[in-house]
Amino acid sequence: MKLVFATGNKGKLREAREILADLAEVVAPSELGIFDDVAETGSTLKENSILKARGYRELCGMDCFADDTGLEVDALGGAPGVHAARYAQDIARRDGLPLPPDHDFSANIDTLLSELSKCPGAPRTARFRSVVALLLDGEEHFFEGTLEGRIAQARSGSGGFGYDPVFIADEYPDRSVAELPEEVKNAISHRGKALRAMAQWIKENICVNQ
């Protein structure tokens, strides 16, 4: 079975290939000569993930899966949530400031730490949440994973991506996710949990019928 993973992120692609190695050949759209983007216009992780899966299914003509991830910070009422990748832009727009580039995670982290500084004494508990949408044989299936933790006071570590330098997972309370080896991070990651749930579903519902 061959599945398109709707991502251009090499780290995500490597993680998915490791988890699905015995079940499916995972290819990226770029490996099929597809470089178009699909707009993430949904208001929830589930909506965005299925929008991407549908879009790339149409572009590639193959069964497809896609993910969307958000960061939920309790002291900020669940923000940035589904808007994690453009949080700095959202806050700059709110405050009438110049807009930083899209997907600028250095600016996003600065904005997150700044917003939390306005909540002294509030718990810094947070979670990453990933939803994976699988479009297979015309049917849509969804899988979810979370990683619980807290937001650090400052950046540490150079690994990972996104908010990893300021996210401390409950499983490793003495370091940021950006300081964890890749294999350790993948073992506990929100996306990894969602992908493993998808792999288990494929094993139980597809492979047994082949």
Model-derived segments and spans:
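Anionic-ligand binding patches
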Residues: 2-4, 11-210
